[in-house]
């Protein structure tokens, strides 16, 4: 790989440096990225590792440092960071496809009434787009289910009351890739952080938070539990108590079956990817299990106190600091899973960052 990059930045200070502002714009172009280049089937191989294509990452990073309050005994220091990144494919080898797209499939285009190809990688597009079948609820009666569109995903299995309703977007009586809708991207494009430090005489309080916006997560962990009888001993209570049991019971999820939803072709929870969803094991490709990954994380709340010199001089000590803190405290989030910091698109039940506590005494002789 070869990379060309340039940065333009400005570093400003105001009010005797009680307010500082750093702004940096970057633009990085990477040539000859390493990809799996598809091969013709006549070669006997599906792909080969190859250096081809160009990717541009550009964005802005902003850092603001301020001391809003500063008196003889009290001060408040505030640090804010913000970063925005846009990554797009600039160039791919000519393969006869529009935008030289590699991979992907066709979806319905309401603007034209026809179809358009999406997914994979293509010139002028971001990485990591995700599409899924649009879950509308459940069939409440056998009469409703009898009118369901044909579902090749379910290999011809007939629908019944309690099965999932997926939108037939193009109204052709068939559920296929053309009916998948765009859900979002797997990586956030906006991230930031907040650091507050408050000091009063020898007492210091530090509060650290960070956030991310712009990504979606497919809760494959919940989808697998709901869609596989082999996991019924680990079933999520919220999901189990909210599964369809009878007509118009207000449930959120399709019926839970002893038979595996996946193996027995119910396909109420786990759907095939059709080349534009995610082919990763555990992906649901079902909008029911997608949600925004936006979060605000509380990383640290710590407290420290420097004992006054008048207290410690008699002990022939130069400094004594007592401290305590809590770390990885929790999140404000929209995602219903445990851990929103997932940038691969699929949550396999990743264990979240462990919450930590510490306390101690630091002594200088």
Predicted regions span which residues?
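Amphipathic, heptad-repeat alpha-helical segments used for oligomerization and assembly
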Residues: 173-178, 182-186, 281-293
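Short, hydrophobic/aromatic alpha-helical segments in well-folded domains
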Residues: 9, 176-179, 191-194
